[in-house]
Structures are given as C-alpha cells and as structure tokens.
C-alpha cells in the first residue's frame, strides 16, 4: 500500500482504562465493548444509537470501508487517501461497512467479527446471527450490493473474508472474553469498573457491605431501641421512661398500664404535653399577676418616697424566682408597648395618606372646572404651508407630479 498507517491506541472515554474499539455516532464517543453494553443498555432511546468500528488509520472516525487486501477498516477520508491516490491500490478488494444498533449478545458480536469464542464453526454462528441479530450478515460482510458493484466485483470468497476486524482483532477478542465472563459471573450484568462518574475519571471504590451484615446490624439496632431492653451481659439495667407514671423506672418494675407487644399509643405523650402546657400557662398567669401587683406597689412606693425624700428600695429583697418573673413580665410589657406604638404610628400614617388623597382629588376637580377646550395650532409654519399646497380630491400633490 502506498501510504503507511499509524497504529495508535485510543482509550475508552467512559472508563478510561480499556482500549476503545467502537465509535458511537450519536454521542460522538469512543467506547470499549463492556462500556458500550453498559451505556447503550440504559434505555430504549440509547439502544437506537448506531455504532461502528474505529478507523485503523486515524483512530478518530467511524469506519465505512473494509479493505480485505490490507486487512484494514478505514473511514471515508482515509479510504479515499489510500485507495484514491494511486492506481495500484485502487484494485484492492473492499466492501462497505455498516454500523449496528441495539445490544447484541457476545456470541452475536463474535459471529459478526469472525471471532470463535466457543469453538463452533463460523457458519453456525452466521446462521444464529441471521436469526437473532435483527440484520443479515450481508450488511456487515458485503454491505449494499449497489456499493459493492461500484467498488469491485466480488464473489463468495469475499463474503467469507469480510469477517476480518482489522488490526484490533486481538483487543476485540480480549474484550469479548471479558464481556462473556461478566455476563456469566454477574448473571447478565456488565462488568464496568466501579467509581466511574461519567467523565472518564475513576474515583476510589467505596467499601461494600454484605446484605446479611446490614440485616444483622439493623436487628441489633432494633433490639437496642426497644423500651424494655436490658443489658444482661454487663449486668447493668437501663432506666426506661414510663409515660404513665411520668418518671423513669427499672425494666423489672411493673407498670400500672402494661403495653401489649409492639402496639404503642402516644396518648400519654399527648396528655403529658397538654399538662405541661397547662402548667406553664398557669405559672405564666400567676407571675404576670404578681408582677402587676408588684409594679403597682413599687409605683406607689416610689411616689411616697419622692414625697418624703426617702429612697425607694422596698422590693430589693425579692427572691430569684420573683426577679426572673419580673424580668419576663417587663420584657412582655415592653414588647406590647412597642406593638401598641407601631399600631398607633401605622394608623396615623393611614390617616395622613387619606387626607393627602382627598386634597389631591379636590385640586384635580378645580383644575377640571377651569379647563379650556380651545383649538390651538401647535406648528404654525406647517399649518400655513398646508393651506397653500395644491390638493387633488383632498390629498396633497407631490412636487414631482406634473
């Protein structure tokens, strides 16, 4: 052959580990066989993607022609450069190559590419492929009859030779073996490297935990969260909370109301919350009343001390609880005073806005009464020129018209 082909290895764009042997036209991605099965078996839409082999010369484009003389698969441009440049290479036996879609099995791919995985004859694989693959071997081996007649005359021997995969046949054989082992060991799942995040970068594989250990850990956690759980191994009894008594007790002590099995009602919790809320409200009311009385008494004491010039230090000996209630009530009183002031300011603003709106409406009505509807001429020069221009049927006559 006149030109020398450069054999370059292209890594798979999905896993980044194995050599890419297929080119997906829809995704414009180069994939190895396991990743191709993994990607295009995701849904029905991805199964429609047409894939074909990668050119042996440029390793960038999908193949369109197979050269039997040089045992190469070439894209359209490389085929034109190789076989269209000289007359000697134009006589090489070539055939068109078509892509495939779907998710063919390992045996079907091996039969298409002429690779013997199970030791069977290629004719048996060819018959199996014709029945199951969804497209005949003629589209793979010889391509379209019209294209084949335009290239070179072909015979039966050309069909038998059309199974050659090119220079990457050994790589395809290894990936088919890997794919076959993945189907057998994984029960139909494709063996794809773990940690792939889509961009070709591989992350560290996360440690896996067996399903049995997860069940055991869940059962242990469930036993540890039971209400009557007792640690017999250490000899220490755990305290449990009794919602009926409102306090904690030992698991061995009998409860007034025994719970039956796993049926557990939260009525006691609701009652407990309601009782707590009622107690808090009562305590708040009492503290508010006490503070009100203290405030009135302190006010009177201050007035008396002012009149008698005696410092008002009457209630300085109050307990800490009373002082806490006093601070709480003062905070509430201050908040209520601020809210009252805010409401008063808002009402004043609304009244001012209403008054301003009434004044504006009155001014508008006064202007409307004195409004004059006289016909005024805004552009006097245009008016004068329009009166002197010639009209025909009410329309102006252009200066260029005769």
Swiss-Prot record:
Keyword Zinc belongs to the record: yes
Chain positions covered by the region annotation Disordered: 287-322
GO cellular component, one term: nucleus
Residues forming coiled coils: 345-372
Signal peptide residue numbers: none
Annotated Zn(2+) 1 binding sites: 12, 15, 35, 40
Positions with a binding annotation for Zn(2+) 2: 55, 58, 78, 83
InterPro entries attached to this UniProt entry: CCT_domain (IPR010402), CONSTANS-like_Bbox1 (IPR049808), Znf_B-box (IPR000315)
One GO BP annotation of this record: regulation of DNA-templated transcription
B box-type zinc finger segments: 12-54, 55-97
All residue ranges annotated as the CCT domain in the record: 357-399
Annotated keywords: Coiled coil, Metal-binding, Nucleus, Repeat, Zinc, Zinc-finger
Keyword Nucleus in annotation: yes
Location of the protein in the cell: Nucleus
One of the record's GO molecular function terms: zinc ion binding
Family as reported in the entry's similarity comment: Belongs to the CONSTANS family.
Protein name in UniProt: Zinc finger protein CONSTANS-LIKE 14
């Amino acid at each position: 052959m006149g030109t020398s082909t450069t054999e370059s290895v292209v890594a798979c764009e999905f896993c980044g580990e194995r050599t890419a042997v297929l080119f997906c036209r829809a995704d414009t991605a180069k994939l190895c066989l396991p990743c191709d099965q993994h990607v295009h078996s995701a849904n029905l839409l991805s199964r429609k993607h047409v894939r074909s082999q990668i050119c042996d010369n440029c390793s960038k484009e999908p193949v369109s022609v197979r050269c039997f003389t040089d045992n190469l698969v070439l894209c359209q441009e490389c085929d034109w450069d190789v076989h269209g440049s000289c007359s000697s290479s134009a006589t090489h036996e070539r055939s068109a190559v078509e892509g495939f879609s779907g998710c063919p099995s390992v045996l079907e791919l091996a039969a298409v590419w002429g690779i013997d995985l199970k030791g069977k004859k290629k004719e048996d694989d060819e018959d199996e492929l014709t029945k199951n693959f969804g497209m005949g071997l003629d589209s793979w081996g010889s391509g379209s009859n019209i294209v084949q007649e335009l290239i070179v005359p072909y015979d039966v021997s050309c069909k038998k030779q059309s199974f050659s995969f090119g220079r990457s046949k050994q790589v395809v054989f290894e990936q088919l073996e890997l794919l076959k082992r993945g189907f057998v060991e994984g029960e139909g799942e494709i063996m794809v490297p773990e940690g792939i995040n889509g961009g070709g970068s591989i992350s560290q594989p996360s440690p896996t935990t067996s399903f049995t250990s997860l069940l055991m850990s869940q059962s242990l956690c469930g036993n540890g969260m039971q209400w009557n759980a007792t640690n017999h191994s250490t000899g220490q009894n755990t305290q449990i909370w009794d919602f009926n008594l409102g306090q904690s007790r030992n698991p061995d002590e009998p409860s007034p109301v025994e719970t039956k099995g796993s049926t557990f009602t939260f009525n006691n919790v609701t009652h407990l919350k309601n009782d707590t809320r009622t107690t808090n409200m009562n305590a708040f009311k009492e503290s508010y009343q006490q503070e009100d009385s203290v405030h009135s008494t302190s006010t009177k004491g201050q007035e008396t001390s002012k009149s008698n010039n005696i410092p008002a230090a009457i209630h300085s000996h109050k307990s800490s609880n009373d002082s806490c209630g006093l601070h709480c009530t003062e905070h509430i009183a201050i908040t209520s005073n601020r809210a009252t002031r805010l409401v008063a300011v808002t009402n004043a603003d609304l009244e001012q806005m209403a008054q301003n709106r009434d004044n504006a409406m009155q001014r508008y009505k006064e202007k409307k009464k004195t409004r004059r509807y006289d016909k005024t001429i805004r552009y006097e020069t245009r008016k004068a020129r329009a009166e002197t221009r010639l009209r025909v049927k009410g329309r102006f006559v252009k200066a260029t018209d005769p």
